[in-house]
């Protein structure tokens, strides 16, 4: 018999750094999910990723207090800021540029994000990443 679904939730947790402190602990605890079990499983799954990279995670939890999680790749903005060597995007992206990235770097980011993007091919994924760069004030050369 299938488990009864209780709900889903989304968290953004740094890779390899899940711990019971806020915001992870309270978010899981109020839904009755075993916090330490989640932290151990999350840290084990993200140990091969870059430490501290923000990982969007979709947690599906069931009435018997069990859960499954799907860990996605870090946001395109994270990769773009890293490639452009900037701390944050522009406050007025249409008038101000904060950094530049090359087309090769955009392709590399698109290839890394391909499984999470709604694109059929690498060119479509590159257009999505280019849009993110434009909205952050990062110029592509």
Swiss-Prot record:
Q: Which gene name does the record give?
A: rplK
Q: Which GO BP terms, alphabetically?
A: translation
User: CDD domains, per this entry?
Assistant: Ribosomal_L11 (cd00349)
Task: Say what the protein does.
Answer: Forms part of the ribosomal stalk which helps the ribosome interact with GTP-bound translation factors.
Q: What protein family is recorded?
A: Belongs to the universal ribosomal protein uL11 family.
Q: What is this protein called?
A: Large ribosomal subunit protein uL11
Show the PANTHER family listed in the entry: 60S RIBOSOMAL PROTEIN L12, LARGE RIBOSOMAL SUBUNIT PROTEIN UL11M
Q: Which top-rank group of organisms is this from?
A: Bacteria
Q: How does it assemble?
A: Part of the ribosomal stalk of the 50S ribosomal subunit. Interacts with L10 and the large rRNA to form the base of the stalk. L10 forms an elongated spine to which L12 dimers bind in a sequential fashion forming a multimeric L10(L12)X complex.
Q: Which GO terms describe its cellular component?
A: cytosolic large ribosomal subunit
**Ribonucleoprotein among the record's keywords?**
yes
Organism for this UniProt entry: Dinoroseobacter shibae (strain DSM 16493 / NCIMB 14021 / DFL 12)
């Amino acid at each position: 018999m299938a488990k009864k679904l209780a709900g889903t939730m989304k968290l953004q947790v740094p890779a390899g750094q899940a711990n019971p402190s806020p915001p992870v602990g309270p978010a899981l605890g109020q839904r009755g999910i075993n916090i330490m079990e989640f932290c151990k499983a999350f840290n084990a799954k993200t140990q091969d990723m870059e430490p501290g990279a923000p990982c969007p995670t979709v947690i599906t939890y069931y009435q018997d207090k069990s859960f499954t999680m799907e860990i996605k790749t870090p946001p395109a903005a994270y990769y773009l800021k890293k490639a452009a060597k900037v701390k944050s995007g522009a406050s007025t992206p249409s008038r101000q540029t904060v950094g530049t990235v090359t087309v090769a770097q955009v392709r590399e980011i698109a290839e890394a994000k391909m499984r999470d993007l709604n694109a059929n091919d690498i060119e479509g994924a590159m257009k999505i990443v280019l849009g993110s760069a434009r909205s952050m004030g990062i110029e592509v050369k």
